[in-house]
Amino acid sequence: MHNIHIHIDGADHTPRSIRNFINIIASKNDLFYKALQIEPDRMRFCKKMDAALVEKMNRRRPKTMAAIENIWYEGYSESRSTHYHNSRYHFLNLHSFFNGNGTIELRGFNSELHAGKIRSYIVLALALNHQALTQKCASSKKPQVENEKFAMRTYLNRIGLIGDEFKNCREHLCRHLSGNAAWRFRAA
């Protein structure tokens, strides 16, 4: 079974925004994996952000794309120019950014024919990209998620998926989460 990979133009990204993107994905890994129903057997092709990579990125605070690229490929013995490089098999793939088409790839989406779900995937990818580009800094710290549905809904609102225009996106992205979308501490 193939999956949906969304490629976003990386031309406007800076070292700061790439680090933001890494931290955003790292902090929301668990929530995204549950919301998007990423199956355990797909994990080898769609790994969560590597904690060691995130830690190195935040400790070193690279100021150039070359420095970010070096950190991204650290620990891999194969050539960086290898098309099917092992670094690419993560929810957030920067291999396509550094080698080839200059795009940032998000790989966490199931094969789907439902137009509303596909739209939700694309809107989420674009909103994540926008957050990475515009936010001054992003933390890799995982948020408290005692109520997954509330956490996802408030996060989606925070990144701009507000109003009737994004109602279906919010519904699709919160559908498989537990809890109550309206109340943080009230049972569903």
Task: Give the predicted meaning of each segment.
Residues 1, 7:
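Active-site histidine-anchored catalytic micro-motif
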Residues 12-188:
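C-terminal accessory/tail domains of diverse enzymes
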